Amino acid sequence: DKDLRYDLNEISNRVSKNTSMVFICNPNNPTGTMVGSTELEDFCVSTSKQTCVFVDEAYYDYSILDGYPTMTKLVKKGHNIIVSRTFSKIYGLAGVRIGYIISNSERIASIKKCTMAGTNMLATHAAIAAYDETDFFKYSLNKNKEAINYFYNLFEELNLEYRKSHTNFVFFKTGVHIDKFGKYMKEKGILVGRPFPPYYDWCRISTGRIEDVKIFGEKLKEFYS
């Protein structure tokens, strides 16, 4: 919709007997926006009666402070739903490539039939260690919030349109084609997100160490000066 959020009513209207699955990423990538828990829960309950609903909660951990409850509770209630999580985001294990899904036993069994290989032991132990490291989790959450707030203030100062984020990035409107913007930033030693059609004049910028985020801010101000 105009706020770059899912139009769940329109999605519901398009579901038919030929629909194999409905996929929802919440919080969403690349917009960073989030569908409210009650709205999404009602949608999942209704739609899962017609087809399987896959809810990607890769950025769920960043939305905890915003009061977003997971849709895993619907799995426990027996609804035809799959919920996925990853250790690639707040846990910092992107290179390890490990995550998990939550669904009913029959659905899990059918998915396992399509699995190419099992998870290696290094990834498994790394995930367990990361999950148990609650201090690092809190540290990551706080550092991400610090960078997100810096972005908000930066875009407000430059009068740039953006969307409030519930992830580890912010989606903002550059006013120019992303290829031109990306080329400029690359020349300054900064890599920004790829194009996300049809939003060719929007950019997804990720958080990082606050000192690095501030360097981006300096170069962004130069771009619009």
Positions of predicted regions on the chain:
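Active-site pre-lysine segment of PLP-dependent enzymes
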Residues: 5-18, 30-53, 57-90
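PLP-dependent enzyme catalytic core of the Aspartate aminotransferase-like
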Residues: 38, 42, 183-188, 192, ...
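Short acidic/glycine-enriched loop/turn segments that link adjacent beta-strands
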Residues: 95, 166-167, 198-201
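PLP-dependent aminotransferase class I/II
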Residues: 80-156, 160-163
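Conserved PLP-binding catalytic core of the aspartate aminotransferase-like
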Residues: 145, 155-188, 207
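Short beta-strands and strand-loop turn motifs
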Residues: 21-27, 53-57, 163-165
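Hydrophobic residues in well-ordered beta-strands that form the structural core
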Residues: 55, 83, 119, 192-194
